[in-house]
Amino acid sequence: MTAEISQAVRIAASMAAASLALASSVAAGAEGVAWGGFAQSHVVARTSRVDCPSGTACDFPAAELRGQLKAEGKNSSGDAAFLARLDLLRDVAVDDTRLVTRELFGDLTSEKASARLGRQVMTWGVGDLLFINDTFPKDWVAFFTGQPMQYLKLGSDALKLNAFPGPANFELVIAGFRPDNTPTSRRFIFADPLPAGLPRRTLEPGNDSGEVEISGRISGYLHNWELAGYVSRTHYRSPAWRVAGAEIVGTYPRLNTAGASLTGPVGKGVLSIEAGYYDSPQDRNGRDPSIENPQFRGLVGYSRQLWEDATLGLQFYGEWMRDYAAYRETLPAGFPVKDRLRKVATVRFTQFFAHQTAIFNLFAFVGLSEEDRYVIPSLRYAFSDNLWAEAGANLLGGKRNGMFGSLQDNSNVYLTVRYAF
């Protein structure tokens, strides 16, 4: 049995060939393949004059042209399908040209089950830009530079199995490791407490049976409430850095999580609750300062319509560090001190105008314990069904030892224009 699981893992960890073969077989029997895509321009300008280190894109952290080609199809019976999204981008701000496989997967479905193999984007949990049981990879560079929200999530090379035999739905994901895309000095300015001048390298987990990532979810409805339970055996997706001789090495420690969520109507709005426990099996006593201390995380959110075409959403989020005394004892000099209980509140206000062709959106993070903030206003206008433009900002501030305050020199404004075909 173990050998069979290991083999399935290796297949799921290197999806491109298998997905392409499955997609090709589906396309061969498809009644027709639907083609689409878009062309997009995205320019980001820093809001203040700052002294940038050598090698950092300073005045314009991003200046990107991107084209996406999408193809999808299914066979005549509808029980097999495929989807592919390929992006070609050129960012002159950092001299980067790449062909990116955003998604590439094949689907097989039946009345009581389905399977998806390939690169796919997955979203779990009920938080609005707050993630507890969603441990899948994310692109924080795209987020902090104002890319369309679809680019916050990165695709996982995975095998996803769904079963819906009755009132409960079951989902199992077997995936290879993929790290978050985290801010670096290529585009961002931030304090670095690690020694300067030492070379850095990261060691990513392998895809053998000991390093595979497995996540599961069970969900269902009780009256008008949706309930879900989650478990995962994954990795932290940001590197844990430590000095090793004459270099700095980043690893991705193991992460085990378990949690639950529920959402349903309360009054004239919707209440959302989610909680989870983050276990660091490589440092359960909290004495390795490079590995995140085990934590309890939770959020409560409420959203409702204020008036026609206007909605308001509020959230309160907390992280409670389990072994705080060990964390304080082993924290290296020069590193900012975290509170045992980190508290964050969020607010989202959305207003539609002009028959919903214009959308004003305001999202704000407020660090209640770290005394910092991150405000994201945006205005989008659809000139037609195919063409839209969005202007917005990423405004960070507050105390510099906070998550958002430490990035305040990276506040920016952006303009995105997209034509879809």
Locate each region found by the language model.
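Residue-level signature of outer-membrane beta-barrel architecture
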Residues: 33, 71-75, 107-110, 119, ...
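Outer membrane beta-barrel
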Residues: 72-190, 223, 398
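Outer-membrane beta-barrel "beta-signal"
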Residues: 349, 395, 407-421
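Detector for outer-membrane/organellar transmembrane beta-barrel domains
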Residues: 232, 263-285, 289-365
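Repeated loop/turn-to-beta-strand initiation elements of outer-membrane beta-barrel proteins
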Residues: 33, 77-82, 112-115, 167-170, ...
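Hydrophobic, lipid-facing positions within transmembrane beta-strands of outer-membrane proteins
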Residues: 63-69, 101-104, 155-159, 212-216, ...
